Curated annotation (Swiss-Prot):
Keywords: Capsid protein, Host cytoplasm, Hydrolase, Metal-binding, Protease, Serine protease, Virion. SUPFAM superfamilies: Positive stranded ssRNA viruses. It comes from Avian infectious bursal disease virus (strain PBG-98). Capsid protein VP2 self assembles to form an icosahedral capsid with a T=13 symmetry, about 70 nm in diameter, and consisting of 260 VP2 trimers. The capsid encapsulates the genomic dsRNA. VP2 is also involved in attachment and entry into the host cell by interacting with host ITGA4/ITGB1. The precursor of VP2 plays an important role in capsid assembly. First, pre-VP2 and VP2 oligomers assemble to form a procapsid. Then, the pre-VP2 intermediates may be processed into VP2 proteins by proteolytic cleavage mediated by VP4 to obtain the mature virion. The final capsid is composed of pentamers and hexamers but VP2 has a natural tendency to assemble into all-pentameric structures. Therefore pre-VP2 may be required to allow formation of the hexameric structures. The keyword Metal-binding applies. Residues 950-993 are annotated as: Disordered. GO terms for biological process: proteolysis. This is Structural polyprotein. Residues 494-736 form the Peptidase S50 domain. Its EC number is 3.4.21.-. InterPro entries: Birna_VP2, Birna_VP3, Birna_VP3_dom1, Birna_VP3_dom2, Birna_VP4_Prtase_dom, Viral_coat. Residues 956-967 have a biased composition (Basic residues).
Length: 993
């Protein structure tokens, strides 16, 4: 994203550079015709951004100015690479006397060069391309358009900027300019073979254009070549001039290459060309070149014949002209019907990788770019599908602003693609992500860690292919394994001398991806399957610790394990294979450390494997180097698997140590195991205060354990509301980074503590305090507090001053609850029910009796909407929850306006009081407006029409009221008759008679 700042291109061009964002801001004045054209070079690697032209009254464009970056890059930097660029064109400034923004914009991106365009008129631009993602039309100038630079090539080198270099010579002020010689563009122009010129002598000579050709140049160029002339006329003199012509048709540069060159008869006369035009002389884009020949005769008289013939060619070399983005594509933005004198603003940002010149390098730190083949390959794949993904080169500015979040989501390889899913692009992007990483892992073996870290939709197996490509094969040589319905992915490998051909197969509903890996190394056996489908399994958490010695745990974590029927060592990580324990019936449980006998009687063998996640009918295997487990934490899950033999994974984790007597013993580290279950969206079942309290014996467990747990709500650990926002992520990273280890000594120590607690009440109390600290997650806090209070003085003072049971402070804090039982706030469910009841009571006070608490809960915990209220008022039927009834909200209700209301409105509109009454025709017009508006008065547009109608009727009505005479300034004001007092009335003539 250009507006988010510069970033290094993640390719393998590793040169130390600095990143810089350069702004471009121009206020362009609109010409007399109100039309103009802005030419952008969105991919040009340098300071040039574009050029502005105004349309003249004769229909031709006139050059106004070049558009550049704010800083002149060649003055401080030697080499450059363009990373990204975006430019916005809009108008928000009005000249005096103009009160509204007028005008529209057409914009198009043309994949060729500027000189190749044949129609650059406002409407003709839209025919330059048929790609709808490269053109937009009739955008209001107030909204504006945004031009986006999309890469046309990758893995590009740095471009020399044409920086000045001091020259050594007689004049120390002379400088040399080092231009880019990388990828020049060469135009070869050939004159017609044996071109024949014939004319009569004229004073001042006869001028002809020998040739004219289209070229494109905005940087330095050179012209080289030669022409050969032959003549049979004595005294002929030739002059040759080369013109470089701009886009507007005016001459930008003129160079005389021959002046008064005499021709010798009967021989070849050579005229060589060798011109160099520096960048600073090219003041506007060049689009054509012309060679003119002036023919004259020494001592010629009127009527003398002048004859010659010519042949030859020349070449125009544009330095760096074929560098991708330098001259093509171009984006043209044309505006039309904008008020004269208005200001069109061009603003944007260009992001560069720059290598400073030696002077600046003394004070500027440079760094190498980041080589990320995955990101580079992903970018190529995304932009190759840009038409399908809706990525355009020109945008309405408001639409581009709205799409920025979509671009940011697509750029993040780990994003869940929510916005892309809303636009229907999710499947395309996910397919691209699946393709991008195998190519990275195959072609770039050192990037194997990247393949493991890509995230959603990428299989960990691809990283193993990268290891195989680098010489450590991860597939068994010559052992073909067929894909089955249970296995989502597997590796099939065959040894062919020094090559290993590996194919990644998937089940029929997924595509097949093939990859060829070359390896001279020795093959080692490994399967590395990551997911098992439709496999019955039971789950149980195991506490895993990192220890400093046999009795000092350093950190506690927990891992979820699955019990699968049969011998399935191929699903285990290499660290667990070959290790098993026998049960009382002689069967084996693989994945356990060979420590004694498991106190269970089973009817078959089982395998215990670590897992990372569980889905509806599949489990995701873990590749962490987990050692064989010890202890009896998995006895309950193994027993359940042996009795019920489920066909799908049971979505409830089990905990508890089942002994030979059928009793379920409580386990320690309750909060750690709960966190592990919740992280996978599972509930924890076992004896005690777990999510499901199954009781202390096997019979109670069978009755209370849910046999259809797949219908339970999943509460992902990462989204639990009572945790800090980043707690789930930190827990996940901690588990991924921990060094797992569990020892038999730790299990023995736990059992020894439980035995001591049964004998010593004081130790039982101490153990209860420890479990209380562990369950509430404050073990570390208490340990830190103990270090700061070695003699327990602060703790004694705290306990001595603690409120006693029944005290005033105790009742104020805990209410009527017992000591130590702190009053709690309502649960989310209770708070939601209280809110529903509160809304229902409020509706009841307003006379809306159908909004019961149950109805409010079904309506999304909100009161009735306007549509629901209208429906209930009109039909007196209870509206359905979550139905908006929009027809009742927006339906127009007809009502008739009274004649008095219409007459009053007509009189008010037709004229002021005291003037003539409105004619019946005008009253009828007002009545029509009221009828159209269903009884409402006229709106603004209708009021304008009625005022115009009244004005016309007044002018053609001979009986219209005469205008009132203006009062004379010297006329005495007449005192209006009125009351002389409260009890005195005026005497009239009748009273006198």
């Amino acid at each position: 994203m250009p507006t988010t700042g510069p970033a290094s291109i993640p390719d393998d061009t590793l040169e130390k550079h600095t990143l810089r964002s350069e702004t471009s801001t121009y206020n362009l004045t609109v010409g007399d015709t109100g039309s103009g054209l802005i030419v952008f070079f969105p991919g040009f690697p340098g300071s040039i951004v574009g050029a502005h032209y105004t349309l003249q009254s004769n229909g031709n464009y006139k050059f106004d100015q070049m558009l550049l970056t704010a800083q002149n890059l060649p003055a401080s930097y030697n080499y450059c690479r363009l990373v990204s660029r975006s430019l916005t064109v809009r108008s928000s400034t009005l000249p005096g006397g103009v009160y509204a923004l007028n005008g529209t914009i057409n914009a198009v991106t043309f994949q060729g060069s500027l000189s190749e365009l044949t129609d650059v008129s406002y409407n003709g631009l839209m025919s330059a391309t048929a790609n709808i993602n490269d053109k937009i039309g009739n955008v209001l100038v107030g909204e504006g358009v945004t031009v986006l630079s999309l890469p046309t090539s990758y893995d590009l080198g740095y471009v020399r900027l044409g920086d000045p270099i001091p020259a050594i010579g007689l004049d120390p002020k002379m400088v040399a300019t080092c231009d880019s010689s990388d990828r020049p563009r060469v135009y070869t122009i050939t004159a017609a073979d044996d071109y024949q010129f014939s004319s009569q002598y004229q004073p001042g000579g006869v001028t002809i254009t020998l040739f004219s050709a289209n070229i494109d140049a905005i940087t330095s160029l050179s012209v080289g070549g030669e022409l050969v002339f032959r003549t049979s006329v004595h005294g002929l003199v030739l002059g040759a001039t080369i013109y470089l012509i701009g886009f507007d048709g005016t001459t930008v540069i003129t160079r005389a290459v021959a002046a008064n060159t005499g021709l010798t008869t009967g021989t070849d006369n050579l005229m060589p060309f060798n011109l160099v035009i520096p960048t600073n002389e090219i003041t506007q884009p060049i689009t054509s070149i012309k060679l003119e020949i002036v023919t004259s005769k020494s001592g010629g008289q009127a009527g003398d014949q002048m004859l010659w013939s010519a042949r030859g060619s020349l070449a125009v070399t544009i330095h760096g002209g074929n560098y991708p983005g330098a001259l093509r594509p171009v984006t043209l933005v044309a505006y039309e019907r904008v008020a004269t004198g208005s200001v069109v603003t061009v603003a944007g940002v260009s992001n560069f990788e720059l290598i400073p010149n030696p002077e600046l390098a003394k004070n500027l730190v440079t760094e190498y770019g980041r080589f990320d083949p995955g990101a580079m390959n992903y970018t190529k794949l995304i932009l190759s599908e840009r038409d399908r993904l809706g990525i355009k080169t020109v945008w309405p500015t408001r639409e581009y602003t709205d799409f920025r979040e979509y671009f940011m989501e697509v750029a993040d390889l780990n994003s869940p693609l929510k916005i892309a899913g809303a636009f229907g692009f999710k499947d395309i992007i996910r397919a691209i992500r699946r393709i991008a990483v195998p190519v990275v892992s195959t072609l770039f073996p050192p990037a194997a860690p990247l393949a493991h870290a890509i995230g959603e939709g990428v299989d960990y197996l691809l990283g193993d292919e990268a290891q195989a490509a680098s010489g450590t094969a991860r597939a068994a040589s010559g052992k073909a394994r067929a894909a089955s319905g249970r296995i989502r992915q597997l590796t099939l490998a065959a040894d062919k001398g020094y090559e290993v051909v590996a194919n990644l197969f998937q089940v029929p509903q997924n595509p097949v991806v093939d990859g060829i890996l070359a390896s001279p190394g020795v093959l080692r056996g490994a399967h590395n399957l990551d997911c098992v489908l439709r496999e019955g399994a039971t789950l149980f958490p195991v506490v895993i610790t990192t220890v400093e010695d046999a009795m000092t745990p350093k950190a506690l974590n927990s891992k979820m394990f699955a019990v699968i029927e049969g011998v399935r060592e191929d699903l285990q990580p290499p660290s667990q294979r070959g290790s098993f324990i026998r049960t009382l019936s002689g069967h084996r449980v693989y994945g356990y450390a060979p420590d004694g006998v498991l106190p269970l009687e089973t009817g078959r063998d089982y395998t215990v494997v670590p897992i990372d996640d569980v889905w509806d009918d599949s489990i995701m295997l873990s590749k962490d180097p987990i050692p064989p487990i010890v202890g009896n934490s998995g006895n309950l899950a193994i027993a359940y698997m042996d009795v019920f033999r489920p066909k799908v994974p049971i979505h409830v984790a089990m905990t508890g140590a089942l002994n030979a007597c059928g009793e379920i013993e409580k386990v320690s580290f309750r909060s750690t195991k709960l966190a592990t279950a919740h992280r996978l969206g599972l509930k924890l079942a076992g004896p005690g205060a777990f999510d499901v309290n199954t009781g202390p014996n096997w019979a109670t467990f069978i009755k209370r354990f849910p046999h259809n747990p797949r219908d339970w709500d999943r509460l992902p650990y990462l989204n639990l509301p009572y945790l800090p926002p980043n707690a789930g992520r930190q827990y996940h990273l901690a588990m991924a980074a921990s060094e797992f280890k569990e020892t038999p000594e730790l299990e023995s120590a736990v059992r020894a503590m439980e035995a001591a607690a049964n004998v010593d009440p004081l130790f039982q109390s101490a153990l209860s305090v420890f479990m209380w600290l562990e369950e509430n997650g404050i073990v570390t806090d208490m340990a830190n507090f103990a270090l700061s209070d070695p003699n327990a003085h602060r703790m004694r003072n705290f306990l001595a001053n603690a409120p006693q049971a029944g005290s005033k402070s105790q009742r104020a804090k805990y209410g009527t609850a017992g000591y130590g039982v702190e009053a709690r706030g309502p649960t989310p469910e209770e708070a939601q029910r209280e809110k529903d009841t509160r809304i229902s009571k409020k509706m009841e006070t307003m006379g809306i009796y159908f909004a019961t608490p149950e109805w409010v809960a079904l309506n999304g915990h909100r009161g009735p909407s306007p549509g629901q209220l209208k429906y209930w008022q009109n039909t007196r039927e209870i509206p359905d929850p979550n139905e908006d009834y929009l027809d009742y909200v927006h339906a127009e209700k007809s009502r008739l306006a009274s004649e008095e209301q219409i007459l009053r409105a007509a009189t008010s509109i037709y004229g002021a009081p005291g003037q003539a009454e409105p004619p019946q025709a005008f009253i009828d017009e007002v009545a029509k407006v009221y009828e159209i508006n269903h009884g409402r008065g006229p709106n603004q547009e209708q009021m304008k029409d009625l005022l115009l109608t009244a004005m016309e009727m007044k002018h053609r009505n001979p009986r219209r009221a005469l205008p009132k005479p203006k009062p004379k300034p010297n006329a005495p004001t007449q005192r209006p008759p009125g009351r002389l007092g409260r009890w005195i009335r005026t005497v009239s003539d009748e009273d006198l008679e």
